[in-house]
Each structure stands twice: as C-alpha cells, then as structure tokens.
Amino acid sequence: MVSRDFIFWEVDVQADFMLPGGKLYVPGAEKLLPNIRRLTDAARQGRVFLVSHGDFHAPNDPEFKIFPPHCVKGTAGAELVPEALTDKVVRVENDAAAKIPDDLSNYQQILLEKQTLSIFETHHADALVQKLGNQAEFVVFGVVTEYCVSFAVKGLRERGRRVAVVQDAIETLNPEDGQKTIAEWQRLGARLMTTDQALSALG
C-alpha cells in the first residue's frame, strides 16, 4: 500500500550530473546510485509515491551563461539514470498547457521538467504540492546539495510541508558550502535521515 505518511522527492538524478563524463558531472555522485535505486525501488513496489524533477534545457538556455551546457532536452545527458526511474512515470512539461493527471494513483512517479534551479519557478510544482496535501512528510534526495536540492527543501518548508533529507543520497560540489546548506535546512525545521531510516519508516 502506498504510504500516506511519506512522499519521496527526487532532485535532478540525471546522467549529465550523476555519471563521470556528464556535461556537469558532480564528483562522487555515482556513488549515490545504489541508495537512489533502493529509494526508487520503494516506489516501484508501490510503497511510496515518488516526485522527481530535472533540468530540461533548450540548446540556447540563458543558464548556459552561468553553467556549462548540460541536460539539453532530447539528449541522453538529460535523461534520468535508470536507478531513478520506476515503471509507471507520468512526465509533465514546464508548459502552462500541460496538465497534472487528476488521479495520480495510476502512477508510481511524476517527473516535472524545469529550466531553472528552483522547481517552484515552474508552472506545476505548486499545484502538485497542493494536490499531495500537507499530511505526508516530504523525503528529499538527489543533487546538488547547495543548489537544486536546497531550493526544493526550502521551497517545501516555505509551503508549510514537513521535510526530511536523505543525507547518504545527496552530493555536494563544495563540502564546506554543503555543510552550511545542511545547517540552514535544519534551522528551517528540516530533519536528516539515512536511506535505511527512510525505508524503515515506510514500514
């Protein structure tokens, strides 16, 4: 049975970030893949609903003035790694005309596309969080700690949701910045857990 107490929230687990040789590879990110798979397996098994989001950029995206080109939509680098995907995914483009399905129970996972660091700058993130309600705790994991993961954690907290972060399923670019970011999350009321703890909590 799908948990009513937890929702898993997966950030940018895409080939260009996660794999050596990726366009914006996060050193060490591939070491997270066993835990990413374990967390995603829980959604595959119908134990928890999985929200995922990722970068899906146009070739001339303005972000490429700040970061090297990465996760260009339609390229292999933009795709979620296999460990991060379930068998029943609904994908929602960042377009006002796109729709979140009325009944998410037909799916194990929803994948929201974004073009900026914050998922909450997209058309559908707020509506999805509203639809998911405020009973469940949102369990966040992925990359990168001090960028998109942090925007997700802070965005969920700003919307009054309880948040936990899976500390052995996130990766940072700069360890010092990562520690400061984690401390900020804790000040905002987010808690830390391990992959084992996240899975045990599902019962």
Which sequence ranges carry the predicted segments?
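Extreme N-terminal starter segment of soluble prokaryotic enzymes
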Residues: 2-8
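A short glycine-rich beta-strand->turn/loop micro-motif centered on a GG-aromatic cluster
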Residues: 139-142, 161-175
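Short acidic-hydrophobic, aromatic-tinged amphipathic segments that line or gate anion-handling sites
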Residues: 190-201
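Active-site flanking residues adjacent to catalytic metal/cofactor-binding acidic residues
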Residues: 9-11, 54, 141, 167
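Active-site alpha/beta core segments
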Residues: 34-137
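Residues at the starts of beta-strands that form the adenosine-phosphate
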Residues: 5, 49, 137, 161-164
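Histidine-anchored nucleotide/phosphate-binding helix
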Residues: 36-42, 147-158
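Acidic/histidine-rich helix-loop elements
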Residues: 18-29
